[in-house]
């Protein structure tokens, strides 16, 4: 398994257990699911109608996003102006690190990142923002949105802002 760790905060943000797709050469997107957690009843796949139960969320359980829950991501809020301030600083930091470690990737990063940020700004109200578990304000924001079907959530992380660790 490969764990993707934020190069600034050291927080684990995603793994290859989720189906990753590279977008614009700079973003990993992964579809998520909403799952039930908590409560004492463990779902073992029994027939709910025969067990006198339904598919409702029981008391003591909570419906959560599996990626957000698994990696203990913390929701945060931005307005457009504060997001742009954050993303400019973050992109500058990643570009500086790339110039030292992999200068050939700088132009790919700049072009792809600019295109993806425009996409986020264009549909800003649809996005949710998360930080890693440490809540480091300089660390990467994990972006969450829904696919065109309106029901499938996905997360997005910056390829150049993570290091892949095989465990």
Curated annotation (Swiss-Prot):
Principal cellular location given in the protein's record: cytoplasm
GO MF assignments: calcium ion binding
One record GO biological process: translation
PROSITE patterns in alphabetical order: TCTP_1, TCTP_2, TCTP_3
Keyword Repeat in record: no
UniProt-annotated location(s): Cytoplasm, Cytoskeleton
Statement: the UniProt record of this protein carries the keyword Protein biosynthesis: yes
Sequence ranges assigned to domain TCTP in this UniProt record: 1-167
A GO CC annotation given for this chain: microtubule
Swiss-Prot/TrEMBL keywords: Cytoplasm, Cytoskeleton, Microtubule, Protein biosynthesis
InterPro entries: Mss4-like_sf, Mss4/transl-control_tumour, TCTP, Translation_control_tumour_CS, Translational_control_tumour_p
Top-level taxon in the UniProt lineage: Eukaryota
Function field: Involved in protein synthesis. Involved in microtubule stabilization.
Family assignment from sequence similarity: Belongs to the TCTP family.
Protein name (database record): Translationally-controlled tumor protein homolog
Organism: Kluyveromyces lactis (strain ATCC 8585 / CBS 2359 / DSM 70799 / NBRC 1267 / NRRL Y-1140 / WM37) (Yeast)
């Amino acid at each position: 398994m490969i764990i993707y760790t934020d190069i600034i905060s050291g927080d684990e943000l995603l793994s290859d257990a989720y189906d990753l797709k590279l977008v614009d050469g700079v973003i990993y997107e992964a579809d998520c699911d909403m799952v039930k957690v908590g409560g004492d009843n463990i779902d073992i796949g029994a027939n709910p109608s025969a067990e006198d139960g339904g598919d409702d969320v029981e008391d003591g359980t909570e419906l959560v996003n599996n990626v957000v829950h698994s990696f203990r991501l913390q929701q945060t809020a931005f307005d457009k102006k504060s997001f742009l301030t954050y993303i400019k600083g973050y992109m500058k930091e990643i570009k500086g690190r790339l110039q030292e470690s992999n200068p050939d990737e700088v132009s790919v990063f700049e072009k792809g990142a600019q295109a993806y940020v425009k996409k986020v700004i264009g549909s800003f109200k649809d996005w949710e923002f998360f930080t890693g578990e440490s809540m480091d304000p300089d660390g990467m924001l994990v972006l969450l949105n829904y696919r065109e079907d309106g029901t499938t959530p996905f997360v997005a992380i910056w390829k150049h802002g993570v290091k892949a660790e095989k465990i």
